[in-house]
């Protein structure tokens, strides 16, 4: 069977960036990584209705910069910033003795954010909307918002069937093996009374690097040199 590489990991250093940016010793690495996982899980569970797409974390010494990308930033910020201040205090209690700075940015076009699209489809399926209707609605909204291509897959015991299967729709182009292609990817889980359904979404927004192979290799080399200097 043909296996697919992760579209985000495949493009890191070319058109995509890391969600966590920090360097640490081998001894501290597990604890630091676990802190990142706890921070992301806490924020996502606390603001389930805020439409959180990504949580990026940067570390410098004892300072942690957390950036939240959300389709509804007002829920996280709160009235006069009261909610975001409370979140900052709660996170500082979790990580212990570290200074946290928070920033909340808006996802301008949620119809083109693969993670938000996947979570919206999962929510509709949990509310007993037909999976095909939810998939086609997401595809129509993405194409109308300017996507060059979109692929949506639902996998599991669809409709309570005895055997698990996968259904997918593809509209437009999806050049998964082209490094310069700006492809966003998201995954969500729908919990139904028959079991768990997995939803995957790929959205192609066009090319970021207009040049050919030479320009892409030059960009990779420049990134490697800059990373070596930082270390």
From Swiss-Prot:
GO terms for cellular component: cytosolic small ribosomal subunit. Keywords: Ribonucleoprotein, Ribosomal protein, RNA-binding, rRNA-binding. The keyword Glycoprotein does not apply. Transmembrane segments: none annotated. It holds the Pfam family KH_2. Residues 39-108 form the KH type-2 domain. GO terms for biological process: translation. GO terms for molecular function: mRNA binding; rRNA binding; structural constituent of ribosome. InterPro entries: KH_dom, KH_dom-like_a/b, KH_dom_type_2, KH_sf_prok-type, Ribosomal_S3_C_sf, Ribosomal_uS3_bac-typ, Ribosomal_uS3_C, Ribosomal_uS3_CS. SUPFAM superfamilies: Prokaryotic type KH domain (KH-domain type II), Ribosomal protein S3 C-terminal domain. Coiled coil: none annotated. Binds the lower part of the 30S subunit head. Binds mRNA in the 70S ribosome, positioning it for translation. Part of the 30S ribosomal subunit. Forms a tight complex with proteins S10 and S14. Belongs to the universal ribosomal protein uS3 family. This is Small ribosomal subunit protein uS3. It comes from Hydrogenobaculum sp. (strain Y04AAS1).
């Amino acid at each position: 069977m043909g296996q697919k590489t992760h579209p985000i990991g495949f493009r890191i250093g070319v058109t995509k960036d890391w969600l966590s940016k920090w360097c640490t010793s081998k001894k501290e690495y597990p604890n630091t990584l676990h802190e990142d996982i706890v921070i992301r899980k806490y924020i996502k569970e606390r603001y389930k209705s805020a439409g959180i797409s990504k949580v990026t974390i940067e570390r410098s010494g004892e300072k942690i910069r957390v950036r939240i990308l959300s389709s509804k930033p007002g829920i996280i910020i709160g009235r006069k910033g009261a909610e975001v201040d409370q979140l900052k205090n709660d996170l500082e209690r979790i990580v212990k003795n570290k200074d946290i700075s928070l920033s909340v940015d808006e996802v301008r076009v949620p119809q083109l954010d693969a993670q938000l699209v996947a979570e919206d489809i999962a929510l509709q399926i949990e509310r007993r909307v037909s999976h095909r209707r939810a998939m086609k609605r997401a595809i129509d909204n993405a194409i109308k918002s300017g996507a060059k291509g979109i692929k949506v897959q639902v996998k599991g015991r669809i409709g309570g069937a005895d055997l698990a299967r996968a259904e997918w729709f593809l509209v437009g182009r999806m050049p998964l093996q082209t490094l310069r292609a700006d492809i966003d990817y998201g995954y969500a889980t729908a919990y139904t009374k028959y079991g768990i359904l997995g939803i995957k979404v790929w959205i192609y927004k066009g090319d970021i690097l207009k040049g050919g192979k030479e320009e892409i290799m030059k960009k990779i080399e420049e990134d490697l040199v800059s990373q070596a200097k930082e270390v």
